[in-house]
């Protein structure tokens, strides 16, 4: 009952009697892992979890796990700080503004409405650290740029040996977002899908596949996140050298590798947003801060009310969809008797 695990065994039979005589390949007696000793009954929490539940530690699924890009960037951040300390170099501008009781400094980026330009810079910097500090060059043919080129330009024979810099990645992503008119939230979801793909498929993003992987993540996130989704043929008009068939095939493989898990919870989204802010702070990509004025305060209040009304409408719509014919979910009010 409850949290206690028990089993019923016949008094004249012992489940251990035959099992203890089993011998493994190494010649040692077999003993089940986690077997209780001295007749004690173990709790379910100490049992080994099945493999299917291992993805709970995936940062793109679990809000408690640190993002992969932030962990990969820490090596460069520590080396940069150590080098600056040894060479007595200032880490950057010492004119960072801090809020006080009389003045509050804010930027125009919030978790509900991030700044597009700053968010793309942070996301592409995260992709840059993924490529630079990758563990190996594991990849799949569907994402190989030479096997499936997205431009008619001839791919260099040593294309897999040169890591792209941050500016190159930023120009590639910014071109897609500007042409497709995508939002900053879509950029954050793109990074979530990218890290989920690397974890699920057990591959690395490297010079030979980064364009295909980033394009597939943007394509999928734009369809999931934006209300007015961009069609594959629209991306073919942006990148005129790729066919619709190739785009459809890449999207299909991307979804299969994600195991069709395109869900992004609010907590995971918020974690990626704030980790991107931390990444920007570690690399001196400071957001433009301005003093809080009455006009900006009213604008922030209007944005908050708009988001609050939006979430209320979504919750009401979900409630209406969940009401059955018997009105089991509906709120019932008793009739008042006025005497």
Swiss-Prot record:
<dbReference type="GO" id="GO:0019901">
    <property type="term" value="F:protein kinase binding"/>
</dbReference>
<feature type="region of interest" description="Disordered">
    <location>
        <begin position="1"/>
        <end position="42"/>
    </location>
</feature>
<comment type="similarity">
    <text>Belongs to the cyclin family. Cyclin Y subfamily.</text>
</comment>
<dbReference type="GO" id="GO:0060828">
    <property type="term" value="P:regulation of canonical Wnt signaling pathway"/>
</dbReference>
<dbReference type="Pfam" id="PF00134">
    <property type="entry name" value="Cyclin_N"/>
</dbReference>
<keyword id="KW-0195">Cyclin</keyword>
<dbReference type="InterPro" id="IPR013763">
    <property type="entry name" value="Cyclin-like_dom"/>
</dbReference>
<feature type="compositionally biased region" description="Polar residues">
    <location>
        <begin position="1"/>
        <end position="13"/>
    </location>
</feature>
<dbReference type="InterPro" id="IPR036915">
    <property type="entry name" value="Cyclin-like_sf"/>
</dbReference>
<feature type="domain" description="Cyclin N-terminal">
    <location>
        <begin position="141"/>
        <end position="263"/>
    </location>
</feature>
<dbReference type="GO" id="GO:0005886">
    <property type="term" value="C:plasma membrane"/>
</dbReference>
<feature type="compositionally biased region" description="Basic and acidic residues">
    <location>
        <begin position="14"/>
        <end position="24"/>
    </location>
</feature>
<dbReference type="InterPro" id="IPR012399">
    <property type="entry name" value="Cyclin_Y"/>
</dbReference>
<dbReference type="InterPro" id="IPR006671">
    <property type="entry name" value="Cyclin_N"/>
</dbReference>
<protein>
    <recommendedName>
        <fullName>Cyclin-Y-like protein 1-A</fullName>
    </recommendedName>
</protein>
